[in-house]
Amino acid sequence: MAGDLNLKKSWNPALVKNQQKVWEEEQQKLDELKRIKERNQEYKQEQEYLELLKLQHGDQFQIKDLNKQQKLKISKLNWMYDDVPFEGNEKVEENSSGFIESNVEFTDGKSKVENLLKGNHVVGKKRDGSGTSDRINKIIGVGMTKSSKVSYSDDPLLKIKQQQQQAQRVARKQHPSDKHSHRSRHSSKSSSDRVHKSHEHERSRKHNSSHTRHKDGSPHR
């Protein structure tokens, strides 16, 4: 008895490829619904914040009447002005544009130089082995996880290169006499070649002299 011929039809819903298409469309609709909910939540939060501003400044308030942080929050630009957390003993100043200013970069190392000039060998700030200050390391490390900081050491190509260099160093340490033996063999070969050439030259000189005496009629001994 022949099987179900409907399984050979491309429109059959029992086929795996058709079920996969249905599942993918359902996932797309779920993602779209999730994005719509997120936008509605953001809009709701904005409306609540505007209601709070109306209670604080009145119904007819204008943007110019708000302070700096409120303007940035309404325009959704406050995340651009979030600076690195400063050290406890560092003085924080803000300019008219809302940027945080610090004079630590200009005065960094001043106390150390003054102490050296006075004869007091006291290190002013703690530094690491590379010579960079803690503040610079803090700024560089913002937004980086522990795994991302050590990602450079996990580079497979770098590891392969290091292994090759290590193998070359070990080979040079294990066979230090190969180079000298090669030089000695080369020097012995060159000296033997010079001796052989000198013998050939001596034989040719004797042969030429005997041939000259034979032409002159002198008796050949």
Swiss-Prot record:
Protein name according to UniProt: Pre-mRNA-splicing factor CWC25
Family to which this protein belongs: Belongs to the CWC25 family.
Quaternary context: Associated with the spliceosome.
Comp. bias regions, Basic and acidic residues: 191-203
Pfam family, one: CWC25
A GO CC term assigned to this protein in UniProt: spliceosomal complex
Main location group: nucleus
